[in-house]
């Protein structure tokens, strides 16, 4: 395009149809036992997570300067919810800079 006003003859569109994409899955398992193992592992995963401690990173603002304070904790999901409720309530975090002052 040259000039201040674009003209229709300056606009060139090249439309080409996309080639067809084969969406068929050709994956094959050796036996149905492998499928059963995968299903069993997927079913057991939430059960293990319920009682097992997991690492979490908590980010919250400093109550004095509003900078981000990061905590790394290891707990179960239920205990983490208690910490969340405490942080939403009256418990506040203080960054290291504000804690020294």
Curated annotation (Swiss-Prot):
A zinc finger (unnamed) spans 62-98. A motif (LXCXE motif) lies at residues 23-27. Pfam families: E7. Residues 1-43 are annotated as: E7 terminal domain. Highly phosphorylated. Homodimer. Homooligomer. Interacts with host RB1; this interaction induces dissociation of RB1-E2F1 complex thereby disrupting RB1 activity. Interacts with host EP300; this interaction represses EP300 transcriptional activity. Interacts with protein E2; this interaction inhibits E7 oncogenic activity. Interacts with host TMEM173/STING; this interaction impairs the ability of TMEM173/STING to sense cytosolic DNA and promote the production of type I interferon (IFN-alpha and IFN-beta). Belongs to the papillomaviridae E7 protein family. The E7 terminal domain is an intrinsically disordered domain, whose flexibility and conformational transitions confer target adaptability to the oncoprotein. It allows adaptation to a variety of protein targets and exposes the PEST degradation sequence that regulates its turnover in the cell. This is Protein E7. It comes from Human papillomavirus 51. The gene is E7.
């Amino acid at each position: 395009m040259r000039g201040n006003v674009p003209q229709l003859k300056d606009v060139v569109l090249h439309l080409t149809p996309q080639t067809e994409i084969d969406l068929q899955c050709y994956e094959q398992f050796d036996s149905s036992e492998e499928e059963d193992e995968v299903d069993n592992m997927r079913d057991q995963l939430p059960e293990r997570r319920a009682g097992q401690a997991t690492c979490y990173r908590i980010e919250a603002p400093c109550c004095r300067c509003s900078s981000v304070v990061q905590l790394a904790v290891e707990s179960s999901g239920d205990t983490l919810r208690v910490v969340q409720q405490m942080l939403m309530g009256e418990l506040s975090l203080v960054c290291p800079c504000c804690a020294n002052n």
